[in-house]
């Protein structure tokens, strides 16, 4: 049995799809791509879910150069097994999920061809049914059952649909209903930076029909080489790009999406970036206005100031693990198992999901929620700046990714964390955080640091926050002495 497990990246499949200047070998070839299609068919058969007969599957791509070829290879397999394929062309990851929800599509499943913000020569697949995105164990099953299938052969057809137009109409209807206004953005100057990914539609298909002036929007054209900057709301160059555009054109707001539009961030009129903790704070304020005393789930590296902000707005902050699917699934679990509801689960990366939207991480939907509130606040004179004014910002925050050179890196890293916990207790005013869900979180005299094992790489990831200048350096000096005892730990990155 051939295994393709090396292509698994958590709940996604990712690989090299194009020849590249780094001479990295192609791993998403025709044979491996079509084997993945077979694996998905086997997963469908194993699930024994009640799909339509014949089954309908929608497939879309982001702007990557290899997307059309991969789609063609997948389609060839699915059609040969009697599965009707809806080719939706350029799409976003959230829109692909919605194709399983929209009654006019009735897709039993959907595949998004994307590799998020990775370099142009990568690509990959995300899978959905109406129940949501496939989990890690589902992807493992697909890749382990990709050789042959007993699924009956058949003959089917391909149709083409404009999913982005239908998805845009869905968002426009949502915004107009919530604001009770046909042109709720009239008088607002809003710039979009799509980074040449799939998010350029947001200008002409959503903002303009709602009355916004979008002069100065940039990099809207799909270009899989991403020639201007990486489409990534966490990337400094990308955030600087949209920030500069906002101030240059004297806009009221800037919006930036990642490649497949499941993440987003915004920029205020003065160029101030609202991503990471600020983005979470803004959406928490909006959510808690609608759902007081509800739970906000975040990942583990959010700031202490954010926790205070959520509490001050009447919410319960549940700081969980890194990994957007971990965060979203925790929100779902809380709703299933407790009497304290969760309406927002969001990671500092910009992946955020709302209960009202199928707990789907959808950057465009999150921006739509912000636009709805912006329209309402405008009438009462309230601004985003005022909403965020009470968010305490740390004086310093840093992340270090420390390579582990040991072949059994997870065991080695686990031992380091255990030893560190014992070591740190010998230092005055340092203590282990009482409530923590991953790695080791240490409370320091000026803030905290969290050290954890990377989800996918041989790394220790160290996040640090201090409320005073120089606090991180003092914490690092303590860590230098400790790390010096571990020869397979490359602590040069800390210097």
Language-model features: where?
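Gly/Ser/Thr-enriched, mixed-charge loops and adjacent short helices
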Residues: 121-246
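N-terminal small/polar loop signature for handling phosphorylated ligands or for N-terminal nucleophile
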Residues: 42, 46, 50, 55-122, ...
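Short glycine-rich phosphate-binding loop at a beta-alpha junction
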Residues: 51-62, 189-191, 294-300, 343
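Proline/glycine-rich low-complexity loops and linkers
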Residues: 79, 88-93, 143-173, 183, ...
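A short, gly/pro- and small-residue-rich
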Residues: 120-145, 267-283, 357-368
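An N-terminal, well-structured beta->alpha segment
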Residues: 1-74, 80-81, 157-187
């Amino acid at each position: 049995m051939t295994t393709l497990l090396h292509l698994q990246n958590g709940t996604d499949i990712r690989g090299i799809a194009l020849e590249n200047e780094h001479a990295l070998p192609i791993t998403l070839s025709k044979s491996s791509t079509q084997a993945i299609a077979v694996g998905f068919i086997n997963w469908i058969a194993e699930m024994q879910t009640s799909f339509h007969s014949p089954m309908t599957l929608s497939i879309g791509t982001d702007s990557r150069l290899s997307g059309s070829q991969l789609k063609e290879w997948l389609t060839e397999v699915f059609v040969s097994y009697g599965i009707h394929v809806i080719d939706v062309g350029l799409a976003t990851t959230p829109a692909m999920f919605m194709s399983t929800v929209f009654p006019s599509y009735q897709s039993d499943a959907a595949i998004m061809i994307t590799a998020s913000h990775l370099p142009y020569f990568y690509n990959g697949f995300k899978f959905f049914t109406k129940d949501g995105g496939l989990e890690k164990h589902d992807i493992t099953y697909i890749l382990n059952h990709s050789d042959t299938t007993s699924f009956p052969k058949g003959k089917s057809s391909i149709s083409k649909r404009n999913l982005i137009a239908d998805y845009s109409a869905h968002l426009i209807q949502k915004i107009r209903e919530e604001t009770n206004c046909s042109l709720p953005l009239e008088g607002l100057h809003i710039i979009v930076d799509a980074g040449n990914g799939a998010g350029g539609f947001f200008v002409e298909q959503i903002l303009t029909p709602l009355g916004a002036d979008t002069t100065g929007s940039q990099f809207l054209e799909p270009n899989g080489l991403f020639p201007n900057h990486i489409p990534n709301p966490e990337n400094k160059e990308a955030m600087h790009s949209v920030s500069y555009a906002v101030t240059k054109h004297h806009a009221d707001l800037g919006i930036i999406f990642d490649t497949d539009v499941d993440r987003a961030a915004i920029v205020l009129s003065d160029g101030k970036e609202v991503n990471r903790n600020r983005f979470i704070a803004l959406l928490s304020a909006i959510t808690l206005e609608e759902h007081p005393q509800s739970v906000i789930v975040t990942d583990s590296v959010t700031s202490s100031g954010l926790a205070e902000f959520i509490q001050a707005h009447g919410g319960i902050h549940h700081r969980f693990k890194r990994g957007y699917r971990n965060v979203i699934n925790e929100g779902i679990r809380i709703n299933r198992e407790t009497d304290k509801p969760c309406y927002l689960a969001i990671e500092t990366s910009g992946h955020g999901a709302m209960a009202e939207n199928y707990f789907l991480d959808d950057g465009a939907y999150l921006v739509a929620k912000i636009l709805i509130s912006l329209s309402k606040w405008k009438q009462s004179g309230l601004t985003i700046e005022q909403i965020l004014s009470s968010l305490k910002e740390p004086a310093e925050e840093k992340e270090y990714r420390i390579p582990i050179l040991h072949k059994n890196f997870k065991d080695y890293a686990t031992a380091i964390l255990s030893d560190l916990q014992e070591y740190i207790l010998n230092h005055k005013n340092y203590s282990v955080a009482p409530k923590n869900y991953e790695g080791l979180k240490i409370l320091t005299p000026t803030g905290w640091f969290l050290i954890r094992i990377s989800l996918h790489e041989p790394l220790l990831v160290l996040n640090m926050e201090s409320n005073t200048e120089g606090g991180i350096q003092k914490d690092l000096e303590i860590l230098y002495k400790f790390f010096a005892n571990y020869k397979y730990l490359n602590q040069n990155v800390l210097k």
